[in-house]
Amino acid sequence: MGYDQTRKLSDEYEISEILGRGGFSVVRKGTKKSGNEKTQVAIKTLRRLGSSPSGTGGGQKSTATVMGFPSLRQVSVSDALLTNEILVMRRIVENVSPHPNVIDLYDVCEDSNGVHLVLELCSGGELFDRIVAQDKYAETEAAAVVRQIAAGLEAVHKADIVHRDLKPENCLFLDSRKDSPLKIMDFGLSSVEEFTDPVVGLFGSIDYVSPEALSQGKITAKSDMWSLGVILYILLSGYPPFIAQNNRQKQQMIINGNFSFYEKTWKGITQSAKQLISSLLTVDPSKRPSAQELLSHPWVRGDKAKDEQMDPEIVSRLQSFNARRKLRAAAIASVWSSTIFLRTKKLRSLVGTYDLKEEEIESLRIHFKKICGNGDNATLSEFVEVLKAMKMPSLIPLAPRIFDLFDNNRDGTIDMREILCGFSSLKNSKGDDALRLCFQMYDTDRSGCITKEEVASMLCALPEECLPADITEPGKLDEIFDLMDANSDGKVTFEEFKAAMQRDSSLQDMLLSSLRPS
C-alpha cells in the first residue's frame, strides 16, 4: 500500500454528510477521488483526547507494519477506546478480511487530532430497520440473520477477538439488495488476547451484556454468543428477554438467567428455536454453543425454521422496540461525549458576562443558515463572517478559541446547534421558560418536536457534575433516558418533554442546570 507523508485525508477523499456520531467518534460518508468508479466509503474519525507525543506531525500519513496503521506508541495510552479500536481493526485486517459478514477496512490516516478509519460503506440500513419494513417476516428470515451474524463471529473469534458490544445497531446491511450480506461492525469495545484496558468495560448496552460481564467475570467469545441469544429472542418476540422496573433488577435477572417463553406468541415459535435461545442464554458460558457450533444447528441452517408468516403482533412489537431502541441509542452515545460536558463553563470563561438576548440567538441561527455553505456546519472563516454580520466585534478576536472549543472532532467545522446551545446556556432562565429554551434550541426545523439526533444533542449538553455518581454502571444511561421516553414514535413533543421533567425533579435539575449560570 502506497505511503506519502504529505498525503492528507482530504487529498484522496471527498468528505460529505455525517452518517452517525458516537461519544468518542464521528462517521462521515466519503468518496475516493481517484479511480473511475468513485468508490463510496465510510470514514470513522476516532477523536484523540490527549496530546500527541512529539514527533507526530499534524496532518501527516503515518505508517505501520500492516496497511499503514499508526503504531501504538504514537497513540496516547490514556485514550483507551481509540487505542483499542486501532488494535482490533489491525487484527481484523491481518486475520479476518475480507469476510462477507465483517466490516472491511480500506485505509487509515492519522493526524495530530485523531485517527481516521476508511471503512466499507454499508448503505443497506440497520438490521431491525429492514425487518420491520418487510412485507413478510418468518422464522426463516430470523434464521438467515443469525446465520450471518454467527459466520462473522466465527471469523473474529478465530482471530481471538471478542466483540463485547454485539447489538442490532452494530449489524448493518451492505446495500439495499434483498440478498445483501449483513455486516458486523463497530469494534470499539472489542478485546483481543494481548490487550484489554479496564476502561473499555465501562461501556456497552446492558440489554445485551452477559452475566459474566456484569459479575466482573472473564469475558470470552461465549459472551458474544449470549448477546446473539438476546438478539434472537427479540427477533422472535419483538421484546427483550429481561424486562424489569429498574436497572438493578434487570442486572439481577441477567445474572440469574431469568427469562421465559410464557407470553402467548411464543406458542407459534418452533421448539427448536426456543431450545436454541435457551442454550445461548445459559448462565454458564462453557455450556453455550460456539459460533462454529451454531452454524451447524438445524434451525440456523433453516431446516427446522418455519416459513410461515409470524403473528402480526410480533412485527408490531418489533416496530415499537426498534423506534425506542434508536432514540435511546442516539442519546446514550452523545451523553458519553466527554469534552462537551464542560463546554458551558469554558464558553463562559471565554466570553465573560456577554449573554446573548433571545433575539440575538435567533439572529445567530439565521446568519448561520445564510452564510454556512455546509448546512449546519461552519468553518472558522464562516463563523467569523457570522459574528461580523451580527455586529459582534467584541467576540471576533475570540472566534478561533470558541471555534476550537466546539470543533468536536477536529475536522475544521463546528456544529451550529452546539454553538447555539452554548450561548443560550449563559442565560438565566427558570421554569417553563428554561424548558422551552432548551427544547427550542434543538427543534432546528421548527416542527414542534425533536428527533432522536436532537434529543441526543440536548442530553449531550449536561454538565459532568450534574450526572449521577453511578453513571458508569452498565445500563444507567438507559435508566435516565427511560424517564423521558414517553412513547415509541421516534420523536418527542414539548409536552412529552415537559411531562417527563414534572414527573422527576432530579431529571429537571440535571437538564436545567445547563441553562443556569455558574
Swiss-Prot record:
Subcellular location: Nucleus
MF term (GO), any: calcium/calmodulin-dependent protein kinase activity
Gene source species: Lotus japonicus (Lotus corniculatus var. japonicus)
Complex and partners: Interacts with IPD3. Interacts with CIP73.
Active site: D165
Protein kinase domain span: 13-300
Documented effect of changing G30E: In ccamk-3; Loss of autophosphorylation and loss of function; no nodulation. Abolishes binding to IPD3
SMART domains noted in UniProt: EFh, S_TKc
Family, as annotated: Belongs to the protein kinase superfamily. CAMK Ser/Thr protein kinase family. CaMK subfamily.
Protein name: Calcium and calcium/calmodulin-dependent serine/threonine-protein kinase
Enzyme Commission numbers on file: 2.7.11.17
Inducing factors: Very low up-regulation 8 days after inoculation with bacteria.
Domain EF-hand residues, every copy: 394-429, 430-465, 472-507
Residues the record lists as Phosphothreonine modifications: T265
Binding-site residues, Ca(2+) 1: D407, N409, D411, T413, E418
Top-level taxon of the source organism: Eukaryota
Function (record text): Calcium- and calmodulin-dependent protein kinase necessary and sufficient for dedifferentiation of root cortical cells into nodule initials. Not required for calcium spiking. Acts as central regulator of the nodule organogenesis program. Required for root hair curling and infection thread (IT) formation upon rhizobial infection, and arbuscule formation during arbuscular mycorrhiza (AM) fungal infection. Phosphorylates the downstream target IPD3, a protein required for root infection by symbiotic rhizobia and AM fungi.
Catalysed reaction equations from the record: L-seryl-[protein] + ATP = O-phospho-L-seryl-[protein] + ADP + H(+); L-threonyl-[protein] + ATP = O-phospho-L-threonyl-[protein] + ADP + H(+)
Residues that hold Ca(2+) 2 according to the record: D443, D445, S447, C449, E454
Amino-acid positions noted as binding Ca(2+) 3 in the UniProt annotation, renumbered to this chain: D485, N487, D489, K491, E496
